[in-house]
C-alpha cells in the first residue's frame, strides 16, 4: 500500500521532516517514490515552516494512497492557508 508520510531528517534536537510518498513496507526514512513537500516544526522568523505540493498530494490520493494522521493535519492546514 502506498502512503504519504513524514520522513525525519535534521540534527539531534532539530527535527526536519520531508513529506514523501512511499510504500508502507519500506522504512520510514528509507526508499520513497516522490517527495511532495517538507515540514519544519522549529521554523522561526522568516523561515518557511511548511511547503506541500497539494496537486501532487491530490494526485496520489486519487491513485489510492493513504495519508498518515500527521500529514492529513498538515494538508488540511495548507489548504486552509492557500
Curated annotation (Swiss-Prot):
Keywords: Ribonucleoprotein, Ribosomal protein. The lineage of its organism: Bacteria, Pseudomonadati, Pseudomonadota, Gammaproteobacteria, Vibrionales. One of its GO terms (cellular component) is cytoplasm. GO terms for biological process: translation. One of its GO terms (molecular function) is structural constituent of ribosome. It comes from the Bacteria. This is Small ribosomal subunit protein bS16. InterPro entries: Ribosomal_bS16, Ribosomal_bS16_CS, Ribosomal_bS16_dom_sf. PANTHER family: 30S RIBOSOMAL PROTEIN S16, SMALL RIBOSOMAL SUBUNIT PROTEIN BS16M. The gene is rpsP. Belongs to the bacterial ribosomal protein bS16 family.
